[in-house]
Amino acid sequence: TSLEEVVVGGYGVQKKRDIVGAVEQITSKDIENRIGSYQNAARSLQGSIPGMTVTFSDGKPTRGATVRIRGENTIGAGGSALVLVDGVETDISTVNSEDIESYTVLKDASSTAVYGSRGTFGVILITTKKPDKGQMKITYNGSYNFYQRSVTPEIVDNGLDWTNSFLESYINGRATDPANINNVFKFSRTWYDELNRRNADPSYEKWRVNPSNGRYEYFGNTNWYDIFYKDYTTGHQHNISVTGGGDVASYYVSGRMFEQDGIYNAGDEKYQQFNVKAKGIVNVKPWLRVENTTDFMYRYSHQPTSHTGISTTPMTVSRMLNHQAYPVALVTNPDGTWTEAAVYTGWAGFVEGNSWRKDRKFDMNNRTAVTIDLLKDVLVAAADVSFYFNQTDRRQAVNSYTYYTGPDSSGERPSGSLYEERSYNRQ
């Protein structure tokens, strides 16, 4: 029966019938077909336990999860659960989901008491697969995946329709015509009348040089979201594991490679993650067992960046699109030079490829455990020691791009810069 099931808890392994606190357990079979679990182990927990929420701020594979065991609306819900992998505190996003044997979720104070204040918001215990005794067994699985934006905004890409909506809203609020659409795009009734004329006759060009000031004027129908974003992107992942051994010694070794391309049409965005795990168990004596587990994780991401123009802090693409990507604006001038809108949105930097951010992360985790059976099946003594090393590197470049506001007038944004930062963490 389910009451006879063995559950991993804060005080060791117990039968479910002997546990007083609120505990839930999920096995690898329960989650093996979960969509996205190969991308991030936390995704396999979504919707698996009543009351527990697993959220991501966006769909980037680099994004870590916020796991709230007691739901979003309870007191103290602002804290995320403590995650332990084989007894060692770990970022769940670094774990290879193929190595996971089971999840145990400790919900209430009685079951998390052993963890003190760190377990205030609940504890998730992840147990990884153990070696299988017997002849060597090699397992491989892989997949090729397609990804698509889950939410795509409805875009008004007709320049005249967009301008009419903007003009109506502005006049209703201020009872006067605007002087500018924004800090880049000027507005005048002369330009608006020309927009109506060119929209009525498609044979006209979507640009002209204003004879009074020599500047370009634009009358486009540009869908900037189609310019920036692909309809879908792809990724692939490969897992291999080797296990075997006898009564004295057994082993489990696994490796994983996951790669996903970016969603942008330019900029060479890419994400890669590699995992290696080695676990060995040696029965030195019938009553003495030594176990060692070593994990390596390497993560690399390259992404094009937008910019503020005055610092190296990236702006999100969506914010720059909201500020600068109006359908009346064009991407390039008739001579192929960048428009001001193309530079301000960040598209020029995406295409030229020299404004970017590269992140690298390396984790190494080693745990050695010794178990002594003092009285078989009655009294057990156990001790373990662990070592954790983490290194992160970030390099970022923001370079200048020239735009032309007329055949003989140009500007530049922003000033070029390059910086690097590095951090280490040893425990």
Label the model's feature ranges.
Residues 1-278, 289-291:
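Short, small/polar-rich motifs associated with maturation and membrane association
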Residues 42-44, 87, 329, 338, ...:
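Short glycine-/small-residue-rich flexible loop motifs, especially phosphate/cofactor-binding loops
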Residues 133-221, 258, 262-365, 380-384, ...:
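Surface-exposed loop/interface segments of Gram-negative outer-membrane beta-barrel transport/assembly proteins
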Residues 239, 250, 378-380, 385:
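Beta-sheet entry/capping signal
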Residues 373-375:
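Long hydrophobic segments that form regular secondary structure
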